[in-house]
Amino acid sequence: MSDLSHIRNFSIIAHIDHGKSTLADRFIQMCGGLSDREMEAQVLDSMDLERERGITIKAHSVTLHYKAQDGKTYQLNFIDTPGHVDFTYEVSRSLAACEGALLVVDAGQGVEAQSVANCYTAIEQGLEVMPVLNKMDLPQAEPERVKEEIESIIGIDATDAVACSAKSGMGVLEVLERLVTAIPAPEGEIEAPLQALIIDSWFDNYLGVVSLVRVKNGRVKKGDKILVKSTGKVHQVDSVGVFTPKHTETVDLKAGEVGFIIAGIKDIHGAPVGDTLTLNNTPDVEVLPGFKRVKPQVYAGLFPVSSDDFEDFRDALQKLTLNDSSLQYEPESSEALGFGFRCGFLGMLHMEIIQERLEREYDLDLITTAPTVVFEIVQKNGEIIYVDNPSKLPDLASIQEMREPICRATILVPKDHLGNVITLCIEKRGVQRDMHFLSGQVQVVYDLPMNEVVLDFFDRLKSTSRGYASLDYSFDRFEPSNLVRLDVLINGEKVDALALIVHRDNAPYKGRQLVEKMKELIPRQMFDVAIQAAIGGQIIARSTVKALRKNVLAKCYGGDVSRKRKLLEKQKAGKKRMKQVGSVEIPQEAFLAVLKVDS
């Protein structure tokens, strides 16, 4: 099938839980990618974590052959993408490899913020967007209302949107038929020099680096010598092929196709995502526009529980960064926790997932410090610095102005829950920018401090709106704000890993809450442990974990008061001596207590 008119490349985009992966399952079933024995629900979500949480984290690609009603057999290359706001970069990467996108909308819930955001990304990249109404078998499906929403919120024509139910398989054939006609075929020259874009890479212990590529021009086959444009290194191709979802080797990959290339690259940084591959004998092929690097929004320190694991931890991070290009890290040391890494994540879910993947796939025990965002600091000498770690904050005397990141958040919420959502946004120091009333929902746009959004805003939003509100946010700008560093002292010593940067108005309240929380979590010692919260030199809250003590008077029956006093004084002196030399072990829960503090 060398003719490009038979190829269709498309992504499936949708909000969380609108049925992307189930629709992908139906496609695979109908086009015979797997036997019935191998078929399972969400067959593409191959990571244990994805299956447990029921979410897609990585974009997965599949090549299927579909015999359409016009008698032709089409090659469908499709990519199932994540729906969660933290993984938007996975979506934009997938879209770069496609000519079209299926916008899957739950006919009961209607359009949600994440589908809007992903849809705009697709339209910006010039893709043909085809709306599909899913879950039509549910009694609460309202196709007419949802079509209206698609037109009013996203602005694409939805009059003839295909209705289907991925679960029962109803209407899925119509989706495939419409797909073949609505989505354009790829453009490219098979005879031109090779030009291929790396969409994703991962590390296999046996094969080295496996890269998923979209071939724009030319062809690549086993034995070819390929050149990686950014590094200038040449590798020999060991095998090429496609996922049907099974790993299937083919003779070659041609223009317009999506598949994998294995070239025995051992160096983890040998094939960066977004890079261009070409053949060794045509080194002057121009570089394809890659993807814009995503900036991490949340930073946290990750430390191995035992310092012997440090090297393994570094290797694990390197391998994970290859697979997840938005993860950034740099070494850091903490007085309390020893050596570790400061890692940058796209959001809280991303951070949880990375920590779980490190603990599971690489068998590490980790301690995480409280996440913070990046602050912009203007110093008295006019220099601007960016701080992602509260303990690195310069002395307050040298700071002229502190600016915090503000993000533009778009929230879609049913009218009944609007009041609660607005109250929540005000509590989080939000400023309302816009409000549109749509058929059943309201779209509100707020400017919110990133610090408030990344920690627990999403969970609070879901609970205050009974799960109906949806959120999409993106970094907008830095804005001057009255911020202070809140330090936690344990027995008079600062614990650098527990420091926080908070708004001055919330600081005393936050300090009190944090201290109370820590009191519950730090186990009782043989001596009193004082927990204090301080801003600069001023202590704003304190509580004490009382000492455990033995009843030294148990052996005195009656007896002289001076005898009792002697024993008590002796105990007191011992406790005092202990307090001078004793150290307090802080459990992992205490570091995470910082997250649970309501502002």
UniProtKB/Swiss-Prot annotation:
Q: Which GO terms describe its cellular component?
A: plasma membrane
Q: Which residues form the tr-type G domain?
A: 5-187
The record lists GTP as bound by: D17, H18, G19, K20, S21, T22, N134, K135, M136, D137
Q: Which family does it belong to?
A: Belongs to the TRAFAC class translation factor GTPase superfamily. Classic translation factor GTPase family. LepA subfamily.
Q: Answer whether the UniProt record assigns the keyword Ribosomal protein to this protein.
A: no
What organism is the protein native to? Pseudomonas aeruginosa (strain ATCC 15692 / DSM 22644 / CIP 104116 / JCM 14847 / LMG 12228 / 1C / PRS 101 / PAO1)
Q: What class of enzyme is it?
A: hydrolase
**Which superkingdom heads the taxonomic lineage of this protein's source?**
Bacteria
Q: Name one GO molecular function term.
A: GTP binding
Name of the protein in question: Elongation factor 4
Membrane topology recorded in Swiss-Prot or TrEMBL: Peripheral membrane protein
Q: What does this protein do?
A: Required for accurate and efficient protein synthesis under certain stress conditions. May act as a fidelity factor of the translation reaction, by catalyzing a one-codon backward translocation of tRNAs on improperly translocated ribosomes. Back-translocation proceeds from a post-translocation (POST) complex to a pre-translocation (PRE) complex, thus giving elongation factor G a second chance to translocate the tRNAs correctly. Binds to ribosomes in a GTP-dependent manner.
Keywords, A to Z? Cell inner membrane, Cell membrane, GTP-binding, Hydrolase, Membrane, Nucleotide-binding, Protein biosynthesis
Provide the catalytic activity annotation: GTP + H2O = GDP + phosphate + H(+)
